[in-house]
Amino acid sequence: MTTQQQATPSGGAEWQQRPERSSLFMLRLMTWLSLRLGRGASRVVLYVIAAYFLAFAPTARRMSRDYLRRVLQLAAPAAVGWRHLFRHFLCFASVIHDRIYLLNGRFELFDIRVHNQDLIDKVVADGQGVFLLGAHLGSFEVLRAIGRQQPGLRVAMAMYEENARKINAALGAINPEAQQDIVALGHIDSMIQVHELLGQGTVVGMLGDRSLGQDDTRAFDFLGAPAELPLGPFRMAAILRRPVLFMTGLYRGGNRYDIHFEALADFSKVPPRGRTLAVQAAMARYAVLLAYYCRSAPYNWFNFFDFWHAPQPRPSRSPEKNQPTP
């Protein structure tokens, strides 16, 4: 795997500038129907949602085609057929649909299998705060389900403020009683809040595959081409001197999810002068693990934007507030 040594401003803000497709009214309606009709009957609507994206979301369709060509190792985007695209959108709709049941405590509906559980068990036993670094790959919600079932495992999420606002709104639409710890990043006291949670033994989850336009990034080989990854999550873990686990909850079809934990990095004993190299090594391993699990479950990738975009120049002034993203 190759790396670019200099920090580059990310063009990943594209995902922020898209108009919000989701409607809280529709989400509430879908939640109402799903909880009353049951998971099996309400899944019929998922085919309609997948067909809608296939027909009326050209950007998502194009990005899906580009990603699938890379992960399936096909010769050209044209080799990705409508069947591949429909399956990709259907997997996305299925995971969003299952979130309704997971947030409402309907864990008995699912077959959730945990791999390398000893890694997270050790965290709980030691009372040690740790970072969980995931991606828009599969479902993070299944981890929260495990957290509610396992005494002593408290999970919080650290994310950008706009995402935090939308997640809270979505949670309220799905289940107003759902308790969710979310730390909005980008404030002066954000790192202090994260530090306090870690000190209480909380597992703090972050997603390491998207950034804001003004964020520093590093470029790593991902599925055969350079892709920019945000430096922020890794830098925070290094500054706070905490271990980091990679986590993904892959949807395998039917009612089955596989949660995978992998040791990613341990910054607890890294001196300040060694942070740069340690962060670089952690990001390199993250890119390798992300590619590995993408190949393991190719239709679980839910980054429907140009992930392999060319770097854009850093703006000379503060960027205007971006529009929300789906």
Feature names for model-found ranges:
Residues 2-3, 37, 53-56, 74, ...:
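Non-catalytic C-terminal accessory region of glycerolipid acyltransferases
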Residues 29, 119, 142, 190-193:
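Well-ordered alpha-helical segments embedded in enzymatic catalytic cores
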Residues 2-134, 170-172, 177:
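Membrane-anchoring hydrophobic helices of lipid-metabolizing enzymes
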Residues 115-117, 158-160, 185-187, 262-264, ...:
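Conserved beta-strand termini and adjacent loop/short-helix elements that scaffold enzyme active sites
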